[in-house]
């Protein structure tokens, strides 16, 4: 991987562009879920003919995008998924040219925490979160002993994060294992 650009050398969209938030957003909470291998064209809430997202469709204030990945590997997709189009170099390593949206949100006054069922530590570190924990850390916590190490362990992490940051602008990023092989061994039939 070409990692020749340091974070201080990256374009900072927060400095180049202006965003003025509407009044009344002092206490704003954003939960951002990175859902692995979920295709927008198979989600009922985004127009798929079958109702594949009945619970998500009922959520208030939910925003879903018809996004596409720039690559098939998580490591490379994470590089370009959270920057503007053209924010990475067109090379095999997808070298970043600008800061990702999460680093920009931090500059705009958001606190943030990231919890993941994967181990892309290089990416989590570049988010500039106040705290992050990944699969091996979360799964080894005493409170999780005897539990299946699956995406559902992210729910109590999210709740605890919201409790730790009860006021202000706060972002919680959840990186799921999603539909990666072998789905049937990671989720109960009831799911």
Residue ranges and their predicted role:
Residues 1-32, 37-191:
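Active-site-proximal alpha/beta segments of enzymes that process anionic O-linked groups
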